[in-house]
Amino acid sequence: MLMPKRVKRRRVHRGRMTGQATKGNKVTYGEYGLMALEPAWITSNQIEAARIAMTRSIKRGGKVWIKIFPHKPVTKKPAETRMGAGKGSPEFWVAVVKPGRIMFELAGVPEDKAREALRLAMHKLPIKTKFVTRQEQEVKGGEADEN
């Protein structure tokens, strides 16, 4: 399970997820990627389940990059506890994902295998996602520069 080794503060505010992802929105390491289309908190267990699904699908071929990390602690109070008495203790960790963020990348496998592996990972995640390739992004980037 992914979680930070050390943190400055044990409890953080919930925050808001507004706008598009400005960082991590391009396929940088691999050839294929899985892009988030909705904002969400992705838990460390969901990231791990998606990673296992992908690695089992591609077997020993190819390489997988996880481009999100759960930095945010989510607190919970025990069941049947009265209100007040402070904030609860950290229960699990989440990664804050905005639309446009590339969450996983793959390389070293044919496109059909990559599509299948990322499709399996999609089903482990609580949001709508999209399969993207590095070539698609380079073409789109070139069109934007010309206009």
Curated annotation (Swiss-Prot):
Function: Binds 23S rRNA and is also seen to make contacts with the A and possibly P site tRNAs.
Domain of life: Bacteria
PROSITE patterns: RIBOSOMAL_L16_1 (PS00586), RIBOSOMAL_L16_2 (PS00701)
Ranges of compositional bias, category Basic residues: 1-16
UniProt GO MF annotations: rRNA binding; structural constituent of ribosome; tRNA binding
Pfam families per record: Ribosomal_L16 (PF00252)
Sequence segments annotated as region (Disordered): 1-20
GO terms, biological process: translation
A cellular component term, taken from the record's GO annotations: cytosolic large ribosomal subunit
NCBIfam families per record: rplP_bact
UniProt-recorded name of the protein: Large ribosomal subunit protein uL16
Family to which this protein belongs: Belongs to the universal ribosomal protein uL16 family.
Keywords associated with the record: Ribonucleoprotein, Ribosomal protein, RNA-binding, rRNA-binding, tRNA-binding
Organism of derivation: Alkaliphilus metalliredigens (strain QYMF)
